[in-house]
Amino acid sequence: MKPKDKKILKPHRPARLKNTRLLDLEVLDELPDNIKFKAKRTPEKVAETYKKDMQLISGRILEIKSNYQYTIEANNKTFTATLSGRLKQFAFHSKSIVAVGDYVELDIVAEPPRIENILPRKNTLTRYLGSNFQRPTILAANIDQVIVTSSWRKPMIKPGLIDRYLCLAALDNIDAIIIINKVDLCEDREKLEETVSYYKNVGYTLLYTSALTGEGIDELYELLKNRDSVFSGQSGTGKSSIINRLEPSLNLPTAEVSDYNEKGKHTTTSTILIPWSFGGHLLDTPGIKTVHLAKDTKSQIPRIFPGFATLAPLCYFNDCTHTHEEHCAVLSALEEGKIPTNRYLSYVSLLNSL
């Protein structure tokens, strides 16, 4: 039987183009020199593209509501606005697309008014979740200073929480002021000053205040005038009471601290930007029990922890962690009693948490 012939494979030839003709190159010479050919736009160009019928004005976000609704101050008026469709695409992937304190461009022709552009931020105050998959939450944007509010009692003072707030502000290059409220409940002023004098010694502004008696309110008033300040701190420390003392017309809600566990209750449920009558703005934030920093900031903590900024450059190793290295200026200061032991232990605890 004759073996079956193998099929001979022929090289594939592309199909011929039909009904096509090449562009006459001489036609290109006849086109005007200023003709513009449409090309793919970069994201930057897309972000700067506005409709012709827009009327844009600059404003600032006072409050973030639900469902893409925002309260905005612009031209001495208050608007309730929404995000443009373009910005909503970014907001779907990031909660930090807009923050209280942001400067924006608002289209007042649209109904309702629409945020078309978010202007560059000077700074942000950002905190992170404590899980391994951290997601940033911007508490406020474009601020001048953070007022770290603590209390001597009800709830008890937590210097470790103050340390974390100060590091949070330092990471974002924001000035920090510490106020110890409810000093009217303190029966031993020497013990109070011994507990917190370290912060004053290393350069922080420290105030003792009482919303009940008015102690320290005048000094705080001068520090807040014509500046944008964010009040942050543990729940129940009296932030709202201090604000009401400074600006009685606000009449912010307050709550009593539990006598059983000396823990405060949340009276501020969202961040809001409020203009002071004496110039500047107030950013009141909800109280939180603890502050988590970004895990990728661990290498910066040895240089920004309260009191370490002037000592870290004196260490022999540039990447000194101040835990075991030889010729460490921080460890030497600890041995000499210049750094309190409890502050150093707070530093180690913060470092190990990252």
Predicted regions, residues:
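Helix-rich effector regions associated with P-loop NTPase G domains
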Residues: 1-28, 35-37, 55, 68, ...
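SH3/SH3-like beta-barrel fold
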Residues: 70-74, 81, 106, 115
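Beta-strand/loop nucleic-acid-binding surfaces
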Residues: 78-96
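Switch/coupling subdomain of P-loop NTPase systems
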Residues: 99-100, 114, 134, 141-143, ...
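Conserved Switch II/interswitch segment of TRAFAC-class P-loop GTPases
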Residues: 109-111, 116-126, 143-161, 184-188
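Canonical P-loop GTPase G-domain recognition
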Residues: 185-237
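A conserved segment at the C-terminal end of the G1
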Residues: 239-255
